[in-house]
């Protein structure tokens, strides 16, 4: 068994073998894609090939894919110029002008969008999969209602893409954000999908100025290695999605069954409409932050919430949105599995977490 047991795949994923091979293959392709000589032309060809491959994975057109440095940048770019309606469980990179509430399971009742005052807003955004509790939202249904109100729709698909099917035409979204390191690509690269029809209605403005890259909409020299690695990583994730989800789901259910045998344990949210890799659980009287710290001493990597908020001793806004008290939210941990995990690792983690919960409770008495 590995010395390190990595159970925090919602924070980031290991670089997959397909992405590693692409990086090694193109390490010497250093030409600036904006240059007119042959080295630059070769780099442009690599970028456009990756754009086509990524577009195919989500049923988009190549010219609808714009490369960014991250999912957060893609989210910020998508929403920066618009008054936006969101939900109360969004990632912090999503600005909130008005929010639609979720139920105790973290799911948006899409019918609530019929009652929203759209008069002063131009865009609605809802994340496809929540980064803390793994809830899958009814994006297609929300988009239909939003469009019926003559509004535009964006979805943050950072936790969805590569893990559940994403078809932008089926979902009928106008914009969609993604981040490479959530599905096996290196950090520092993501993309924003912008539908061609949406661009006809709105004059898309750049968030980052300084050059004419990405059709003049994002300044800055492109991250060639990140881009050429992201394409095969996404292809690999899409190709093996069904079998990996089945395997990871079995591991998740076995681990969850063991953890729920601990007295005073509670699953946050529901297993229904949830990605197969996610567990968000709390233990009465046990600090989530303390449990995470102790697990680290045993080589187990878990989190007490979103990686973007680690180190902040405030209760999760997502857990509070589904009805938890501050104390219950602070007593929660997040475990997110990947296809690299083994049954042996899961059994070890269950055993260690059970013992640590007992230890923390004993120390508090």
Regions found by a protein language model. Name each.
Residues 1-365:
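Pyridoxal 5′-phosphate
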